Amino acid sequence: MHIAMIAGEYPPRWGGIGSVVFHLAGHLASFGHQVTIITRSHNGIAPAQSGVSIVEVPWLKLPMKFTRSYAKNALKVLKRLHQSEPFDVIHVHLPLASFTSKEFKFMEQNIAPVCCSLHGSWLGEKQGVIRAAKAGESATWLNPNDLAIRLTAKWYSRYEKAGLLNTSISVANSQSTLKEFAEWYALGEQYNAKVILWGCDHKVFRPANMDDEEEQLAHEKIRHQYNCDDEKALSHKTSTDTPMLLAVGRLVARKGYMTLLRAMPNILAKHPGAKLVIIGRGHMKSKLMKEAKKLSISESVFIKSGMSFDDLAQHFRSADLVVYPSYYEGQGLIPLESMSSGTPVVTVDMAPLTEMVDDTVGGLFESGNSQDLANTVNNMLSDAQGRSMKAEAGRKLVLSKYTYEHNVNDFLDIYQSILNNHSKSS
């Protein structure tokens, strides 16, 4: 079949949506399907995949407003392409594409049945920003994107509701996301929806192979780079006295980095050789470093703006523990990438993170509570054997439920189902 994928993120925009769309498209193409990605224009070059074509459209470079301008231009291209190579299914990834009810109905009636992926919600994002601000994270009013979300989330939620109520099916990325839409967007209204949690690339994010000399050298280089390099650490032993904590994600307030930094003095009191490595792009780097200096932990904190997928995957393998203190996620892929890499994860005791993480594969702490975060990290660092068991269990969990192979089979079933229903009704 010919599948149109409308996604506001696509590599080289490697956000959560961009990553899952890239891998889903590649897996669909490997099954012999034709995939056309309609995405926002970018100065970089998208990685090529056989069977996947990419069409870029212009967009207004303003927070939130870009979702509407991008959607309008994407629809124009969709209509034009459909005339020469008809589409069988349209897969729209919300919330980064804002279509009206009329536009969704047009697609359904004149082009092809529509599947909407719900990657969280604008109203949920707004609640996350508010919770982060109340918890003393970096000033959210100073970030244009956070400010736009706080002020306009309610307005733009109408486009998400339009997708939920006017397409063949909506697929939420967690039970938590589906609950948000049921309670905030469509109380008492009829719609067709289900839940499929996204997986991760279990071949890229995999446990360490200590028999691979090149990989071992890469591991040692990372541990030396961050000064967490006692002999046990270099040998991947969980009993190391120089543990490496890893946090990955955009440097924005709702990711909870200030809470993590405030936990570090208590972590260092029990594990003085610990180092924290934060990897992410964003406006907060200087503020985070100032906070680290204020807390007298600068020598134990490193912030990297970004790196290649291979380097990132090696960081996951080389870390002793991944910490994910986010105040809001539609799903949150970092914990899966951590578990897939054989590294236990500490995250918040809130859905949707609790849909993937429990005490068999990691640890949970009260959201926004830096003392509880420190206690959870300390308990896990002090239990080397338990951490090894959690690492093994996490990898098994990912392979059993959370891979792109699972996703492609699930979405092919959905595509076929809405195609069949569309044929019966036409």
Annotate each language-model stretch with its function.
Residues N227-E231, K237-K255, L261-M264:
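Conserved donor-binding/catalytic core segment of Leloir-type glycosyltransferases
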Residues G306-M307, Q314-A319:
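Short alpha-helical donor nucleotide-sugar binding micro-motif in glycosyltransferases
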Residues M289-M307:
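Nucleotide-activated donor-binding/catalytic signature segment of Leloir-type glycosyltransferases, i.e.
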Residues S176, G199:
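Carbohydrate-associated surface elements
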Residues W122, S138-S170:
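Membrane-proximal helix-turn-helix segments that form the acceptor-binding/catalytic region
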Residues P344-T347:
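Short hydrophobic beta-strand element within catalytic cores of glycosyltransferases
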Residues Y327:
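Aromatic "clamp/platform" in nucleotide-sugar-dependent glycosyltransferases that forms part
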Residues D359-S370, N379-Q385:
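Conserved acidic donor-binding segment of nucleotide-sugar-dependent glycosyltransferases
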